[in-house]
Amino acid sequence: VTDWDNLVAATQTINEEELKGMSCVAGIDYAKTNDFVVAGLLFKIGEQRYWIHHTWVCKYSRDLSRIKYPLADAEKEGALTFVDEVEISPEYVTEWLAEKMKLYIIESVATDYFRHTLLRDALKNIGFTPEKKNVKLVRPSDIMKVAVVIGYVFSKHLIKWGESTIMRWYTWNAKAEIDSKGNITYEKIEPRSRKTDGFMAYVAAATEEDKIKQRTKVKRRLQTIC
């Protein structure tokens, strides 16, 4: 996807206090609800992006013994929650989003069609439905459109995703595949021990980046620039 140095550059502290009241879009990704689920919020101020994220891991995932990344460290950092249930309920995600809605303006939630099928009712309960046009059902063609932008954002160090290294791990586990027409898609390097859910949640959110309203704080009030 990008060079290691670019991922290290993205692993910086985010001042979440400065983002309060700001516009953002959400991305959600998972392969199986008895494995990993990730949700995140993408902000854009000028050219700089910020990605606030959280991971839920099923304690009964069959892949845990294969994973070398120190998940317990991410839990201590507050970036990850172990779920002591056989499945990760969609409500874990929507409760997290509902809490973030008290702090930020979430314009849209992006996830792919198959994942939305499971999340649909829980998202509806917090006000997000395709009918309201605040849910984006991401297709491969949408990802192809933003892949070049994602590459640019990494190469120019235009994204910060906090001090936890888990996003670095997710992204390093993904690879960019280019077809004969030059279209880019993302694939897993190894599906069981090297998870990509966090990166793909960010990719989903990036497909809705144009929904983020640019705002500035003036005398403790927010004004929309465009």
Residues of each region from the PLM?
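Flexible loop/turn segments at secondary-structure boundaries
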Residues: 1, 32-37, 47-49, 59-63, ...
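ATPase catalytic-site recognition across NTP-hydrolyzing enzymes
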Residues: 1-26
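Gly/Thr-rich phosphate-binding beta-strand-loop-beta motif of the actin/hexokinase/Hsp70
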Residues: 19-44
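An acidic- and aromatic-residue-enriched active-site/binding cleft used to recognize and process polar
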Residues: 29-33, 44, 111-116, 128, ...
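Nucleic-acid-processing active sites and adjacent nucleic-acid-binding tracks
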Residues: 42-108
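Short glycine-rich phosphate-binding loop at a beta-alpha junction
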Residues: 104-120
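Metal-dependent DNA phosphodiester-chemistry modules and their immediately adjacent helices/loops
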Residues: 122-216
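Acidic, low-complexity intrinsically disordered tails
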Residues: 215, 219-226
